[in-house]
Amino acid sequence: MGNEGDDMNGNDMNGSDVRTAFRTCPLCEAGCGLEITVKRGPQGETVTRIRGDMADVFSHGFICPKGSTLKQLHDDPDRVRRPLVKRNGVHEEVEWAEAWAVIADRLPEMMARHGRESVGVYLGNPSAHSLSALLYNRSMLQALGTRRRFSASTVDQMPRQVAAAYVFGTAVSVPVPDLDHTDFLVIMGANPYASNGSLCTAPDFPGRIEAIRARGGTVVVVDPRRSRTAEEADRWLPIRPGTDALLLAAMVTALAVDGLIAPGDHVAPHLQGLDEVVAALAPFTPESVAQATGLAAGEIRSLARDMAAAASGSVYGRIGTTTTGLGNEGFGTVTSWLIDVVNIVTGNLDRRGGAMFTMPVAGAPTTRGKSGTGKGFAIGRGHTVSRQLPEVMGEYPAAAMAEEITRAGDQGIKVMITVAGNPVLSTPNSLQLDEALSELEFMVSVDMYLNETTRHADVILPSPSQLQRGHYDVALLQFAIRNVANYSDPVLPLDDHQPDEWEILAKLGLIAAGLGADAEPALADEVGMRSMVQSSVNDPSSPIHGRDADEIVSALGDEPGPARMLDFMLQTGPFGAAFGANPDGASVALLRANPHGVDFGALQARLPEILRTPSGTIELNHPILMADLVRLHAAMDAAAHQPLVLVGRRHLRSNNSWMHNIEVLVKGKPRCTLHVHPDDAARLGLSDGGVARVTSRVGTVDAAVEVTDSIRPGVVSLPHGWGHGQPGTRMRVAAERAGVNSNILADHTAIDPLSGTSVLNGIPVEIVGVAVAAV
C-alpha cells in the first residue's frame, strides 16, 4: 500500500524537493519493480537514483544492471527529442506540425495511388514492452488496412506460440514452469542468468534457479554453450545445435519403452491423441538420435527417467529452441510442441511444480469467450507475393521483408512504417534489407534513435522516454509465474510539445484514414474505447454482459489514453472490479493505491477451462504438428554431418540491439567476439584475440576471436544486435563499440515453415583466420 503523504503512484509528496516514484522496469521480460528518486530543480525534475523496489510484490528488490540505467537512457544526448525530416539525404529537426504535414501530404496519396497493400509495417521488440504500443498499434494497423505486417516475433518466439495455439487453442496458451515449486527443471536453449527469462516472466530468475537447488531439486541445462546458467546447473548437456526436437522425441520414446507414460488423471480426460503421438515418435530412440544430438543414449535415457521420477518437473525452452534449425530447415514449432509433449507424458502439465498456465489479471484470449472450447488456430489467411509464405498470427515472416520491397514488382511494398525496431540489425540477411529500405518511396519511423534502420526514414517521430510513459506489462504478464499486476503512471512529465506515444500512433492511424494532419488523437481513442466496451457488453461470458455501454464509458472517465483502456481491461478481467460488481477487484485505481503491485496468488490448475480448441480437448495430435515429424526424421541423418555451425548468445547488460548507446552498459571488455573451442581454434589456425572471417551462404563478417572451452567443438558463437556505426546514424557510444552484425550471416531462406520463423541458431559457416583488425 502507498505510504501516508504519498500521491496515487506512491510518490512522496511531503513538501520536499525530493520524491520517490515506483514503476516496473520495461527493459526486459522480468518485470522488476524500481524505486526511483526524483529531485525538483530550476530546470525541472531529474532522476537522481534508481534501485530495486524492496516492497515490490513480485521482484522483492531484485534489479539487473539495465534497470538502473533508465536515467541514462532518458538523458542520452543522442536520443531524438524532436521530429526529424530527411531533406537532401540529411535528417533535420522540425516542429511536430511540420512532421505531421509531411506525412499527411504523402502517406494517403501513396496509399491511394499504389493501394493499401503497398504499405508495410514492422513492429519491433520494444512494442511488447510498451502499454501504448500494445493498445494503439492495433488502431493504426486497422486504419492502414494492409496485411503486410512484420514483427520481431518471427525472429523470436513465434514457434512457441504457434505450437501452443494448435494444442491448446490460443497463441497465449503457453505453459510456464512453476519455478517456485518445481523439483526438476530442464532449461533448453535459454540463458536466464543473462536474459532474465523470456516467455516466463519471473523477476530474479537466477535466484529462483538457486532456490530450486537449495530445496533439493535438480536443474539441467541443454545448450551447446556452457552459459552462466549452465555453470550454475546440476547438469550440462552440450547438445548439437538444431537437434533439440530429436532429444525430446527420444525422451518420449524412452519413457514409453520403460512404461512411464503417465499424463495424470487431471489431464488424461482432456487429452486427445496421446497414443498416436507416442507411436509416431517411436522411430526416435535414444540410440538413433545419439549421433545427431551429440549426446550419449544413456544420457538421454537418464534425463527422461529422472524427470519422470521427480515429484514435479518442467521443460522450459526459449530462443535456442524457437530459432533452431538444421541447415536450411527450421524446427522451432515442432521443438516447442515436443516440449509440451514431454511435460504432458511425465504428468507435469497444469499442476503445482510443473508447467502451468497464468491467469492474466488484465484478461487475455484464455480468459474471454466460452471456456473450454473455441475456434482453434490456423495460418495462411494471406501469402507473401515473392515466395508465397503464409501469414501466421496476422503477420508475415520478417525474413521476407526485403524481397517484398524489391522482388514483388508492381505489388511490392512502396511505403514502410516501423515502430520501435531496428530490423537492419535484427533480421536475417541484414544487408539485403538495408539495401531494400533505400529503395522505398516513403518511410516513417516511430523511434527514440536515429539508428541503422531509421536512418532510411523520411520522417522520424520520437516517442517519449520510458520514464515519461505509464506502464503495465499487458503482454508479458500473460506468461508470469504468479498472477500479479502492477501499474505505474509516468515518473517524469512530457517535454514541451512532446505528444505521448499513444497520441503518435493514434494520429498516424487517423492520417492514414484520410483525416489530415490536424486530426485529434483523442478521436481514435474514443472510437477504440467504445468498441471495446460494446464488444464486452455483448459477450455473454463478460462480467458486464447486458450492462449499458454508455454507463460503462462514463464510469471510465473522460481522460483519453492507455490508462483508461487498461482500467477497462482490468475491471473486466478474471479478478476485476467489474464496475462495482466486485468492489475490491482489479482496477487502475486499485493498482495506483498499491504502487508496489498486487499479488492475486500462485498459479492454479486451469484445465479444462483454458482450452479454446474446436474439440474442447488438448489436441496433442494436431495433424499439422504430426506431419512435421516426417521432415524432422528426414533431417536426422544430416544433423550428424553438419559443418561448423554458428549460434548466438546474450549478455546481461544488453537486450538485442537495445542499450548499446549507454556507456555504463557497454564499457569494459569487448563482448562482440566469436567464441571458438580450443580444438577448433587449433584446427583452423585461430588465436585468442585474432580475427576470423566467418562466411555463410549469404554473407561474411570479420570478428575478433575468443578461444574458450565453454562451447562444444564444432560450434561457434557470436552475439546478435551489434554492427553499429553505419553512415547516417547518431549513436556515438554504440558506434565506438560497433561490433559486427551476426545477422548478415543468417539465411533469409532458412525458416520454420509452420511459423515463418528464421533459423538463427545452427547456421552452417566456414571460418578462416585473417590478418586484419576486426571491424
Where are these regions (language model features)?
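N-terminal export/assembly segments and adjacent metallocofactor-ligating motifs
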Residues: 1-259, 296, 391, 419, ...
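Flexible glycine/proline-enriched surface loops and loop-helix/loop-strand junctions
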Residues: 190-191, 232-233, 283-288, 318-326, ...
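Long, contiguous, secondary-structure-rich segments that constitute the structural scaffold
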Residues: 13, 490-569, 657-675, 679-775
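Hydrophobic alpha-helical scaffolding
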Residues: 70, 89-96, 126-130, 169-175, ...
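Short beta-alpha connecting loops at secondary-structure transitions
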Residues: 231-239, 467-474, 483-494, 665
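Extended redox/cofactor-interaction regions of prokaryotic respiratory oxidoreductases
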Residues: 134-211, 217-222, 246-249, 339-455, ...
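Active-site phosphate/pyrophosphate-binding segments
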Residues: 251, 270-397
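Acidic/polar loop patches that form or flank catalytic/metal-binding clefts of enzymes
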Residues: 48, 149, 262-264, 300-301, ...
